[in-house]
């Protein structure tokens, strides 16, 4: 394990030997990745030139894998002689607000534009297909603007993109690029889990899209429904405005896409497993349990903990 700190004077310090506990946390939406370190006040910490300040760069690598590149945002010390550091990746700088008026842009282009405006580094930004006719956001969190654009990609093109910071570079990946060759299950690194099946949130068996016709002055509806699931669960409907510039065929296609996304029972798992640093929020992994055959799950949140020689991870995962 390698943990490096680079301060504003350009000095590079290897603090690997000082770390007693490490936690690396990632989430699919709305949060930067977090690295939490507990340092023992000894060894290199006693060096007269050693210093850690807010804003310093922190790098974490292990077994040849570059895991985290971020910046110190808080430090806590106390009488126990332990120093606790919290660092965030570049996405932390997207939590500020901004205003944008953009026409005919893709989510990929929105990310590139915001990153350029705020001096953030980008890496691989894979192609998104949906062109947002008009994006108007006033005094809104930059990350929310990006996630909204990615939501349009999912809604209109059915493509669930992963947006994250990959060791210091904002990255956008298609689902196929996020698939890991990893199976969790009994005998496959998993040692505890809880399973939930629900139709209580984000499940709809009927979609009502509407569009106001300026010529006739009437509101036109485009319904699509799964009658079998309406009988099974009752009417669970989504009522939503369609794009003003979309034609009838496009609206009907969008309604069908929304039904395919939402017309199902939600299957989610909370998993405790032996740690594997390849796993982060946004990855797809395979899970094998007695309750079902091997199935592909999306990692919604992921928390790694390293304490001495022990490495575990806690995952919230779901079928999409």
PLM features: residue spans?
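Short polybasic amphipathic segments
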Residues: 1-7, 58, 169-171, 206-212, ...
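An acidic/polar, Gly/Ser/Thr-rich interaction patch typically located in mid-to-C-terminal regions
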Residues: 21-51, 188-320
């Amino acid at each position: 394990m390698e943990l490096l700190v680079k301060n504003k004077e350009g000095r590079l310090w290897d603090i690997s030997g000082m770390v007693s506990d490490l936690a690396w946390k990632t989430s699919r939406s709305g949060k930067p990745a977090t690295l939490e370190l507990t340092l023992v006040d000894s060894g290199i910490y006693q060096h007269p030139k050693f210093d850690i300040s807010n804003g310093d760069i922190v790098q974490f690598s292990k077994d040849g894998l570059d895991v985290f590149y971020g910046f110190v945002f808080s430090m806590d010390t106390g009488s126990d002689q332990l120093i606790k550091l919290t660092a965030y990746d570049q996405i932390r700088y997207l939590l500020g607000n901004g205003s944008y008026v953009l026409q005919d842009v893709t989510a990929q282009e929105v990310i590139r534009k915001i990153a350029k405006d705020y001096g953030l580094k980008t890496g691989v930004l894979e192609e998104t297909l949906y062109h947002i006719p008009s994006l108007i956001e006033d005094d809104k969190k930059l990350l929310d603007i990006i996630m909204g654009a990615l939501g349009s990609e999912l809604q209109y093109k059915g493509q669930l993109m992963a947006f994250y910071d990959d060791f210091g570079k904002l990255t956008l990946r298609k689902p196929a690029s996020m698939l890991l060759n990893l199976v969790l299950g009994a005998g496959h690194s998993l040692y505890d889990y809880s399973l939930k099946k629900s139709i209580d949130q984000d499940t709809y068996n009927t979609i009502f899209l509407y569009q106001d016709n300026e010529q006739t002055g009437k509101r036109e509806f485009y319904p699509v429904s799964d009658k079998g699931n309406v009988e099974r669960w009752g009417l669970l409907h989504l009522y939503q405005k369609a794009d003003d510039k979309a034609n009838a065929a496009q609206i009907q296609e969008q309604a069908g896409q929304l039904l395919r996304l939402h017309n199902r029972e939600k299957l989610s798992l909370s998993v405790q497993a032996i740690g594997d640093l390849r796993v982060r929020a946004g990855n797809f992994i395979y899970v094998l349990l007695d309750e079902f055959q091997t199935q592909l799950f999306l990692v919604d949140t992921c928390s790694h903990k390293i304490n001495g020689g022990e490495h575990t991870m806690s995952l919230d995962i779901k079928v999409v």
